[in-house]
Amino acid sequence: MRIIRTVDEMKKLHREICGPVGLVPTMGYLHEGHLSLVRASKKQDINTVASIFVNPTQFGPHEDFKKYPRDEKRDMAMLENAGVDYVFAPSVEDMYPAGFDSWVEPGILQQCLEGAIRPGHFRGVCTVVAKLFTIIRPDRAYFGQKDYQQYLIIKRMASDLNLDVSVEMLPIIRENDGLALSSRNTYLSPAERQAALVLYRSLLTARSLFDEKEHRAEVIRKKMTDVIQHESMAEIDYVSLSHQDTLCESDEVSAKTIALVAARFGKTRLIDNMFLA
């Protein structure tokens, strides 16, 4: 496995690589969810590149950029064991040099859910991902379903800007008890971690009601909210039943509906989602 530290070196490497390239963009502190993306790339692509970059521009002024968990030595060992060919781990100064002043601003898909609660977040995400696509020139890029809104926005960006990359989504990887894997889970106390299982239970409630032929979004949304509110440690940010292509809130749920939830447990904010069909 080769480690690349600079943009110039990565661009030079691209000219030397033969065969399809798969990109797994990460912010490090890897878990099994990231490794599932690596395995998907290994199945389809001759060359797999993983990036490790904690992107400051997608964090708000009162968010956890400085506290975001980092362990590069551990990450590198995990990626090497997973068979990654190249790791791109640039510095903030190289990705955003002095005078940097160009941004990719997503459109309507950022106006709800995460975008409404975290202003500017998706501008930072789209800008750094566009830069990674331009620097690495992957044939495919792999993202997890847990950040579903991010996946939709990046897929739209790649299409709108004619970026020659296929944006792929892989299912959420969960712990045995249903908690969606997230680098931020490390922030949780034992009690908060137990409380956080309520997000998964709320999603299962939505799917169960849909399976029982309940199609009224208002009814399902209330049941989901009741499940989460029953946990005293949970502070809800949103409970959404949205069309999976547009993220528009649904009045009547269908096989094209996705349930999305976000809540805070102590100082830790978690998100999760589930397709109803």
Curated annotation (Swiss-Prot):
Beta-alanine binds at Q58. GO terms for cellular component: cytosol. Its main location: cytoplasm. (R)-pantoate binds at Q58, Q150. InterPro entries: Pantoate_ligase (IPR003721), Pantoate_ligase_C (IPR042176), Rossmann-like_a/b/a_fold (IPR014729). The active site is at H34. The keyword Nucleotide-binding applies. Gene3D superfamilies: HUPs, Pantoate-beta-alanine ligase, C-terminal domain. Pathway: Cofactor biosynthesis; (R)-pantothenate biosynthesis; (R)-pantothenate from (R)-pantoate and beta-alanine: step 1/1. The keyword Transferase does not apply. It is an enzyme of class 6 (ligase). ATP binds at residues 27-34, 144-147, 173, 181-184. It catalyses: (R)-pantoate + beta-alanine + ATP = (R)-pantothenate + AMP + diphosphate + H(+). GO terms for molecular function: ATP binding; pantoate-beta-alanine ligase activity. The reaction proceeds by a bi uni uni bi ping pong mechanism. NCBIfam families: panC. Catalyzes the condensation of pantoate with beta-alanine in an ATP-dependent reaction via a pantoyl-adenylate intermediate. Homodimer. This is Pantothenate synthetase. It comes from Dehalococcoides mccartyi (strain ATCC BAA-2100 / JCM 16839 / KCTC 5957 / BAV1). The gene is panC.
